[in-house]
Protein backbone atom coordinates (compact mmCIF):
# COMPACT_ATOMS: atom_id res chain seq x y z
CA UNK A 1 0.00 0.00 0.00
CA UNK A 2 1.42 3.36 -1.02
CA UNK A 3 2.14 5.81 1.78
CA UNK A 4 0.98 9.33 0.89
CA UNK A 5 1.30 12.53 2.88
CA UNK A 6 -1.60 14.98 2.55
CA UNK A 7 -1.82 18.55 3.82
CA UNK A 8 -5.12 20.45 3.62
CA UNK A 9 -6.61 23.83 4.47
CA UNK A 10 -9.67 25.94 3.80
CA UNK A 11 -10.28 29.68 3.90
CA UNK A 12 -13.37 31.86 3.81
CA UNK A 13 -14.22 35.55 4.00
CA UNK A 14 -17.49 36.36 5.69
CA UNK A 15 -18.48 32.82 6.68
CA UNK A 16 -20.61 32.47 4.64
CA UNK A 17 -18.84 34.19 1.82
CA UNK A 18 -16.24 33.49 -0.84
CA UNK A 19 -14.00 30.58 0.05
CA UNK A 20 -11.14 28.44 -1.15
CA UNK A 21 -9.39 25.21 -0.35
CA UNK A 22 -5.88 23.88 -0.88
CA UNK A 23 -4.28 20.45 -0.74
CA UNK A 24 -0.77 19.07 -1.17
CA UNK A 25 -0.31 15.37 -1.93
CA UNK A 26 3.20 13.95 -1.50
CA UNK A 27 4.31 10.49 -2.56
CA UNK A 28 8.04 9.82 -2.21
CA UNK A 29 9.66 12.78 -3.99
CA UNK A 30 6.60 13.79 -6.03
CA UNK A 31 4.19 16.56 -5.01
CA UNK A 32 0.86 17.60 -6.44
CA UNK A 33 -0.98 20.78 -5.46
CA UNK A 34 -4.76 20.94 -5.75
CA UNK A 35 -7.02 23.91 -5.07
CA UNK A 36 -10.43 25.35 -5.80
CA UNK A 37 -13.08 27.64 -4.43
CA UNK A 38 -16.70 28.70 -4.28
CA UNK A 39 -18.43 32.06 -4.35
CA UNK A 40 -20.67 31.36 -1.32
CA UNK A 41 -19.53 28.87 1.30
CA UNK A 42 -18.17 28.49 4.85
CA UNK A 43 -14.73 27.82 6.28
CA UNK A 44 -15.81 24.38 7.50
CA UNK A 45 -17.10 23.40 4.06
CA UNK A 46 -13.81 24.47 2.50
CA UNK A 47 -11.79 22.52 5.09
CA UNK A 48 -13.85 19.42 4.32
CA UNK A 49 -13.68 19.94 0.57
CA UNK A 50 -9.87 20.07 0.70
CA UNK A 51 -9.77 16.64 2.36
CA UNK A 52 -12.40 15.14 0.03
CA UNK A 53 -10.71 16.42 -3.14
CA UNK A 54 -7.33 15.20 -1.96
CA UNK A 55 -8.62 11.71 -1.21
CA UNK A 56 -10.58 11.61 -4.49
CA UNK A 57 -7.37 12.38 -6.38
CA UNK A 58 -5.73 9.15 -5.17
CA UNK A 59 -6.03 6.46 -7.85
CA UNK A 60 -5.75 3.49 -5.51
CA UNK A 61 -6.16 2.60 -1.86
CA UNK A 62 -3.40 4.31 0.14
CA UNK A 63 -2.09 4.77 3.64
CA UNK A 64 -2.56 8.52 4.11
CA UNK A 65 -0.84 10.68 6.72
CA UNK A 66 -3.32 13.56 6.67
CA UNK A 67 -2.30 16.85 8.29
CA UNK A 68 -4.97 19.47 8.93
CA UNK A 69 -5.41 22.49 11.18
CA UNK A 70 -9.18 21.91 11.24
CA UNK A 71 -10.46 20.59 14.57
CA UNK A 72 -13.92 20.56 12.93
CA UNK A 73 -12.83 17.94 10.39
CA UNK A 74 -10.52 16.04 12.74
CA UNK A 75 -13.04 15.78 15.58
CA UNK A 76 -15.90 15.16 13.17
CA UNK A 77 -14.16 12.12 11.72
CA UNK A 78 -12.46 10.72 14.81
CA UNK A 79 -15.05 11.47 17.51
CA UNK A 80 -18.47 12.04 16.01
CA UNK A 81 -18.81 10.28 12.66
CA UNK A 82 -19.31 6.79 14.14
CA UNK A 83 -22.18 8.17 16.24
CA UNK A 84 -23.67 10.07 13.29
CA UNK A 85 -23.56 6.92 11.16
CA UNK A 86 -25.33 4.94 13.88
CA UNK A 87 -27.97 7.68 14.22
CA UNK A 88 -28.71 8.18 10.50
CA UNK A 89 -26.58 11.35 10.29
CA UNK A 90 -28.21 12.96 13.30
CA UNK A 91 -26.52 14.47 16.34
CA UNK A 92 -27.31 13.34 19.88
CA UNK A 93 -30.02 16.02 20.06
CA UNK A 94 -31.69 14.35 17.02
CA UNK A 95 -31.00 17.35 14.78
CA UNK A 96 -29.40 16.69 11.37
CA UNK A 97 -25.64 16.98 11.13
CA UNK A 98 -24.54 20.22 9.44
CA UNK A 99 -22.82 19.77 6.07
CA UNK A 100 -24.17 16.22 5.84
CA UNK A 101 -23.62 16.18 2.07
CA UNK A 102 -19.88 16.62 2.59
CA UNK A 103 -19.69 14.29 5.60
CA UNK A 104 -21.25 11.53 3.48
CA UNK A 105 -18.76 12.15 0.66
CA UNK A 106 -15.88 12.20 3.12
CA UNK A 107 -17.06 8.95 4.69
CA UNK A 108 -17.14 7.31 1.24
CA UNK A 109 -13.57 8.40 0.56
CA UNK A 110 -12.34 7.32 3.99
CA UNK A 111 -13.64 3.80 3.34
CA UNK A 112 -11.15 3.49 0.45
CA UNK A 113 -8.04 4.45 2.40
CA UNK A 114 -6.28 3.95 5.72
CA UNK A 115 -5.96 7.46 7.16
CA UNK A 116 -3.83 8.60 10.07
CA UNK A 117 -4.96 12.06 11.20
CA UNK A 118 -2.44 14.65 12.34
CA UNK A 119 -3.49 18.01 13.77
CA UNK A 120 -1.16 20.93 13.08
CA UNK A 121 -1.49 24.39 14.55
CA UNK A 122 -2.52 26.82 11.83
CA UNK A 123 -0.49 29.94 11.09
CA UNK A 124 2.41 28.65 13.18
CA UNK A 125 5.13 28.33 10.56
CA UNK A 126 4.44 24.74 9.45
CA UNK A 127 5.71 24.95 5.83
CA UNK A 128 3.11 22.72 4.18
CA UNK A 129 0.26 24.21 6.21
CA UNK A 130 1.39 27.69 5.21
CA UNK A 131 1.45 26.60 1.55
CA UNK A 132 -2.05 25.08 1.54
CA UNK A 133 -3.32 28.16 3.39
CA UNK A 134 -1.83 30.28 0.62
CA UNK A 135 -3.48 28.12 -2.06
CA UNK A 136 -6.84 28.36 -0.26
CA UNK A 137 -6.57 32.14 0.11
CA UNK A 138 -5.62 32.59 -3.56
CA UNK A 139 -8.71 30.63 -4.60
CA UNK A 140 -10.92 32.55 -2.16
CA UNK A 141 -9.64 35.85 -3.49
CA UNK A 142 -10.73 34.94 -7.03
CA UNK A 143 -14.33 35.26 -5.79
CA UNK A 144 -13.93 38.50 -3.84
CA UNK A 145 -15.28 41.61 -5.56
PLM feature spans:
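Metal-dependent nuclease catalytic cores that hydrolyze phosphodiester bonds in DNA/RNA
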Residues: 145
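Short beta-strand scaffold segments in enzyme catalytic cores
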Residues: 21-27
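A short, polar/acidic, helix/strand-boundary loop motif
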Residues: 28-46, 57
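Extreme N-terminal starter segment of soluble prokaryotic enzymes
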Residues: 2-5
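RNase H catalytic domain
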Residues: 8-18, 52-131, 135, 140-142
Amino acid sequence: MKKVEMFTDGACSGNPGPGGWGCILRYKNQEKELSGGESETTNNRMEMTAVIKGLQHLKESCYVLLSTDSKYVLDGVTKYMPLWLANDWRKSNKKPVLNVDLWKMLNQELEKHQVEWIWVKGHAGHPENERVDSLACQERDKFKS
